[in-house]
Amino acid sequence: MAGVLSKLHNSAQHVKDLAAAYLRDGEKGRQSDIERKSNQFANVQLRIVVMGESGSGKSTLINALRGLDEDEEGAAPTDCTATTTEITPYPHPTLPNVHYYDFPGLNTVKFPVKTFMKKTNFAQYDLGIIVTGSRFTENDQLLAKALEKAGKPIYLVRSKIDETVRSERRRKGYNQEETLQRVREQCISSLKAAGIQEPRVFLCSAFDLDQYDFPKLKETVVSNLSETL
Ligand SMILES: Nc1nc2c(ncn2[C@@H]2O[C@H](COP(=O)(O)OP(=O)(O)OP(=O)(O)O)[C@@H](O)[C@H]2O)c(=O)[nH]1
Ligand SMILES: [Mg+2]
């Protein structure tokens, strides 16, 4: 069992160990087991990799997940031109052992797909977030397949949903729920075509953080990971 799955297993085992210690030694046993486990979990590092095509909104998403404005100190640089050139880790705001890894955009002159896929060790990450823009591309599919092959859970973030809503709104008979549903279904079927059994898709806008699926994404990342710590 690898990555998050094995850490989840450890977490379930943790609960069993606590119960056993309590039955054996009462409250004192439970306390010492908590101390032992806390020390053990202090060394667990979790790595969330954020990947996708250039300009899809990876760095902006990481800043949003960390609760930082783009011009705040410590925020990942973002721009409308190719920006991230080195893999950069950013700590989770409340879980110090958890880091988001901001990747350079796939499919630029500096990072052509072939080199990118060859050089990236997908196995070293615990969770993959793929950020896709207005279309799920062949490169997004390559990333999904590589993460799946490495046995990593995948979240697909369909970014810039505010732009989609804004342009679709002009159509006659526009219905926001239906539009979002269509986009969601398209993302799910693209992931299924890439061989992902249970696609997890989040429609997000970095500029409307309390709308669409961003609150759910933030909560899901924390709830899934905090179980493992
Ligand atoms: N409207 C809208 N624009 C966004 C959103 N997310 C990012 N952007 C814009 O998209 C552009 C690129 O964002 P970045 O976060 O720098 O994209 P990136 O994927 O990190 O880009 P590279 O590092 O070059 O690969 C910036 O101008 C952002 O302001 C969003 O949800 N909605
Ligand atoms: Mg970037």
Model-identified regions with their sequence ranges:
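Conserved G1/Walker A P-loop phosphate-binding module
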Residues: 2-103
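AAA+ P-loop NTPase catalytic core and its hallmark functional loops
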Residues: 78, 98-112, 156, 164-167, ...
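Switch II of P-loop NTPase G domains
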Residues: 82-88, 99-148
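Conserved nucleotide-binding/hydrolysis micro-motifs of P-loop NTPases
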Residues: 105-108, 135-137, 160-164, 207-210
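Short glycine-/polar-rich loops that comprise or flank the Walker A/P-loop
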Residues: 123-127, 150-154, 196-200
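Conserved beta-strand segments of the P-loop GTPase G domain that flank and frequently precede/overlap
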Residues: 128-133, 157-159, 203-204
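P-loop/Walker A phosphate-binding loop and immediately adjacent motor/lid segment at beta-alpha junctions
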Residues: 144-158
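Canonical P-loop GTPase G-domain recognition
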Residues: 162-229
